[in-house]
């Protein structure tokens, strides 16, 4: 967290601040993690939501599952893949970009979500996520319900979910 904040803060005064991209942040994070020589790495997705221009930019560093965009009654994974940050000196992170629809939700999960899904295998659990978000109509509370977490007394300790939405009914 501190590494990314430091990088962003150091570029806010520069003319390049407007050029700051998710891939640039991941590249910096990768370099810094490698410089520690600790054999530590992270998987993550770096996103910039530009509400003024209705644009979403993102870059992936080995995170699974991919974010899911729900709009017009349909959910689909966002594109993009990349290596975890902190493992490879020459890791390449790519920027992806798309216009944001007027009505949408964007769901992000930690890999702990797979522990609460009924499917037996990772690939089938991952494939079921867009269907789950479609059933939930992109709504956070409905997704929690669909995952069986609404009244869960034995909550897995490694599950996180974030839903960003705009004009969702």
Label every model-predicted segment:
Residues 1-19, 76, 89, 100-155, ...:
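Active-site-proximal, acidic helix/loop segment immediately C-terminal to a metal-coordinating Asp/Glu
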Residues 48-51, 99-102, 167:
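Extracellular and analogous surface-interaction loops
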Residues 62, 82, 112:
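A short beta-strand motif that forms part of the nucleic acid-binding face
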Residues 159-161, 168-169:
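Intrinsically disordered, glycine/charged-rich C-terminal tails and inter-domain linkers
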């Amino acid at each position: 967290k501190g590494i990314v904040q430091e990088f962003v803060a150091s570029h806010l005064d520069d003319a390049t601040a407007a050029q700051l991209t998710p891939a640039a942040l991941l590249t910096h994070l990768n370099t810094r993690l490698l410089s520690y020589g600790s054999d530590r790495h992270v998987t993550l997705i770096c996103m910039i939501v530009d509400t003024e221009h209705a644009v979403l930019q993102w870059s992936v560093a080995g995170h699974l599952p991919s974010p899911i965009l729900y709009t017009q009654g349909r959910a689909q994974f966002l594109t993009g893949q990349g290596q975890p940050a902190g493992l490879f000196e020459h890791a390449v992170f790519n920027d992806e970009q798309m216009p944001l629809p007027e009505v949408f939700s964007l769901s992000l999960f930690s890999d702990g979500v797979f522990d609460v899904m009924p499917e037996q295998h990772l690939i089938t659990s991952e494939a079921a996520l867009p269907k789950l978000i479609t059933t939930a109509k992109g709504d956070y509370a409905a997704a929690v319900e669909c995952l069986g977490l609404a009244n869960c007394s034995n909550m897995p300790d490694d599950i996180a979910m974030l839903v960003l939405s705009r004009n969702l009914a």
